[in-house]
Amino acid sequence: MNPKKKQTFDLCLFSESFQYIPAKIALKKAKGLLNKGGQILVADCFRSDVKHSSHNRRPGGGHPLSEMLKLLKDIDLNIISKKEITKSVAPSLDIEQKFYNVVGVGIDKVQQGLVASHPWKMKLFSLVYKTIVNQKKRRRLHDRIYGNIRNSDNFIKFNHYMIFQLSSNKAD
């Protein structure tokens, strides 16, 4: 949707969507769409500055929080309120990981049954799988289904789940 020329809004809302848009573009566009007294609300995940060295991706996502805070100053947006809810949302990752672990048990059972009943088909499947999916991706998938790396502790370590209420210094 392209707003009509000169159309402004009381609120520009980014809920679980901000991390998918270049931050500078999103904030400048939102600021330009605000009417006098309008606000921007951002509720999303931001990266901490903690370095990550595992072959697995960090749980969570988003723009670095340090860059977001700098950008807010550069674009001249005021922080009306800022709330971190990381510890409140983190337990959902433990539930998600347990689900994947249950899926892993199911895959094991099916695989064992197929190896017993169709060994040559499973060898062929394994060969095709290893040809199509590179080792790094296979390792990540294995760790995702059987491991416990994507958990609440790692989410808290590598992320800040923030709610920002922002306003512009617009004087129109």
Predicted regions and their residues:
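Conserved beta-strand signature within the Rossmann-like core of class I S-adenosyl-L-methionine
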Residues: 37-45, 49
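Short, catalytically relevant binding-site loops at active-site mouths
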Residues: 19, 46-50, 87-89
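Short hydrophobic/aromatic beta-strand or adjacent loop that forms the aromatic wall/cage
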Residues: 157-165
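A short glycine-rich, Lys/Arg-flanked "PGG" loop and its adjoining helix->strand segment in the class I
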Residues: 24-39
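A short SAM/SAH-binding and catalytic strip from SAM-dependent methyltransferases
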Residues: 10-24
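A short acidic, Gly/Pro-enriched loop at the edge of an enzyme's catalytic core
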Residues: 2-12
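Substrate-binding/catalytic lobe of Class I Rossmann-like enzymes that use SAM or dcSAM, i.e.
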Residues: 55-151
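Short Gly/Pro-enriched turn/cap motifs at secondary-structure boundaries
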Residues: 152-156
